[in-house]
């Protein structure tokens, strides 16, 4: 995203309360890619000056993206079981995807699983914009049509498991996330993403006390990210065409802890 002409690291992006950054040196996996669109419950944007309570450390803006809050059974309902599923197909590029979620909840406990997958081949323009031919000189069998936009294919899979437990005044929630992107090609870049595996652990506590409210969060995210020339790009370089690609392998880790307390001093004053 871009806010007031500022983007990338000039924006602070929080996904389910986690301050995430791009593990890729070329920023091919921006923070918003860590959550599937079908899991988004709310989006808040603080443009310009950002409150300290949401980070405060950004030039352009702070963007908060959160999954839906845990659902519990109503009083006297017993157990709640619900789910949803969706799918799509797009003729251009033969794009397709599916998503599903399932929830099991009582009055004190909530368990939810989300899964999604999407993939597509190269998409096509409205008409020919180039001559048809091989994708590269060292790939004569990889044929691209005159209307085909090379290096525009992708494949992604996302899984999430959330568990929450509550009492009268307290709530504990744990989220586990797994992302697997075998490939995501870029028609406007020299390199493609040839692998992206991410694991996320997110633990949250919220409690109400006689003196006020306490919130705490601890999280850890690990990403293994790989880049190289994809199937639609020249792979062999050099004077003798003997330099194989330009592999880049990155491992990124992000660990964070946040504690926030609201102390009620009077009906008018609160100390945070």
Regions found by a protein language model. Name each.
Residues 71-72, 79-86, 90-196:
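Periplasmic-side early beta-strands and strand-to-turn transitions of outer-membrane beta-barrels
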Residues 1-2, 14, 30-35, 45, ...:
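N-terminal periplasmic accessory domains that precede
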Residues 20-49:
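Short acidic/polar hinge/loop motifs at secondary-structure boundaries
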Residues 166-179, 197-272:
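Face-selective signature of the C-terminal outer-membrane beta-barrel domain
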Residues 1-22, 47:
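Extracytoplasmic beta-strand/coil segments of soluble accessory domains associated
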């Amino acid at each position: 995203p871009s806010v007031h002409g500022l983007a990338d690291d000039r924006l602070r992006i929080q996904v389910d309360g986690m301050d995430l950054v791009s593990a890729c040196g070329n920023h091919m996996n921006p923070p918003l890619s860590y959550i599937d669109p079908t899991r988004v419950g709310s989006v808040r944007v603080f443009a310009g000056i950002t409150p300290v309570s949401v980070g405060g450390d950004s030039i352009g803006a702070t963007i908060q993206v959160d999954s839906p809050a845990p659902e519990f059974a109503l009083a006297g309902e017993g157990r709640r079981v619900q789910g949803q599923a969706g799918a799509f197909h797009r003729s251009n590029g033969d794009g397709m995807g599916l998503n599903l979620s399932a929830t099991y909840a009582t009055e004190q406990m909530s368990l939810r699983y989300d899964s999604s997958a999407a993939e597509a081949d190269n998409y096509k323009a409205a008409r020919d914009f180039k001559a048809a031919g091989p994708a590269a000189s060292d790939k004569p069998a990889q044929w691209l049509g005159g209307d085909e936009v090379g290096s525009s294919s992708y494949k992604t899979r996302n899984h999430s498991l959330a568990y929450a437990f509550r009492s009268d005044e307290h709530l504990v929630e744990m989220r586990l996330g797994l992302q697997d992107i075998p490939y995501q090609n870029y028609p406007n870049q020299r390199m493609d993403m040839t692998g992206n595996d991410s694991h996320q652990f997110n633990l949250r506590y919220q409690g109400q006390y006689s003196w006020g409210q306490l919130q705490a969060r601890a999280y850890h995210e690990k990403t293994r990210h790989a880049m190289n020339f994809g199937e639609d790009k020249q792979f062999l370089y050099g004077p003798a065409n003997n330099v194989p690609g330009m592999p880049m392998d990155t491992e990124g880790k992000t660990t964070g802890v946040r504690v926030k307390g609201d102390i009620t001093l009077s009906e008018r004053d609160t100390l945070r």
